[in-house]
Amino acid sequence: MELVLKDAQSALTVSETTFGRDFNEALVHQVVVAYAAGARQGTRAQKTRAEVTGSGKKPWRQKGTGRARSGSIKSPIWRSGGVTFAARPQDHSQKVNKKMYRGALKSILSELVRQDRLIVVEKFSVEAPKTKLLAQKLKDMALDDVLIVTSEVDENLFLAARNLFKVDVRDVAGIDPVSLIAFDKVVMTADAVKQVEEMLA
């Protein structure tokens, strides 16, 4: 199959298996959920009655005071006591094998092509690290919510995009299922497309 280059009167021949496969919604959902779960910090923690600071002494005698019986100031019933079912740090990551991950990326890229959300250009750069230059370039292309993927990190482009809302710049190694889905359009250079093909082959 061929992808038309937006900034040149030519087309780029690409693999049908990478950019023309059926959309596997279940697989994409599983991989996206796993990716998001892996990004969780998972460091929350609370203290049980065994861990909170305080004496182990019985606050007052069992009988004769008229007060409710009590055995510890660290009881979960008390203010400043421990938590009954205290949260523990945990690893939320889910296993996704390479074949599934690559399959999900291929499904997403193919769907982007079908929905005309993938824009392929010969090259994409700015002369200087100026936000104004990139903002004007995107305005000329009628783009405002866009992920720009280049074959290698372009420092000028990266610095120019940092202060633009809903604009992100990645190299091929930095793309992931969530970022491909999150943006309205994906602009990819011809070299980046070839690299993606090799990576997912």
Curated annotation (Swiss-Prot):
Part of the 50S ribosomal subunit. Belongs to the universal ribosomal protein uL4 family. The keyword Signal does not apply. InterPro entries: Ribosomal_uL4 (IPR002136), Ribosomal_uL4-like (IPR013005), Ribosomal_uL4_dom_sf (IPR023574). Residues 44-71 are annotated as: Disordered. HAMAP family: Ribosomal_uL4_B. One of the primary rRNA binding proteins, this protein initially binds near the 5'-end of the 23S rRNA. It is important during the early stages of 50S assembly. It makes multiple contacts with different domains of the 23S rRNA in the assembled 50S subunit and ribosome. Forms part of the polypeptide exit tunnel. Keywords: Ribonucleoprotein, Ribosomal protein, RNA-binding, rRNA-binding. GO terms for molecular function: rRNA binding; structural constituent of ribosome. GO terms for biological process: translation. It comes from Edwardsiella ictaluri (strain 93-146). The gene is rplD. PANTHER family: 50S RIBOSOMAL PROTEIN L4, LARGE RIBOSOMAL SUBUNIT PROTEIN UL4M. GO terms for cellular component: ribonucleoprotein complex; ribosome. This is Large ribosomal subunit protein uL4. SUPFAM superfamilies: Ribosomal protein L4. It comes from the Bacteria.
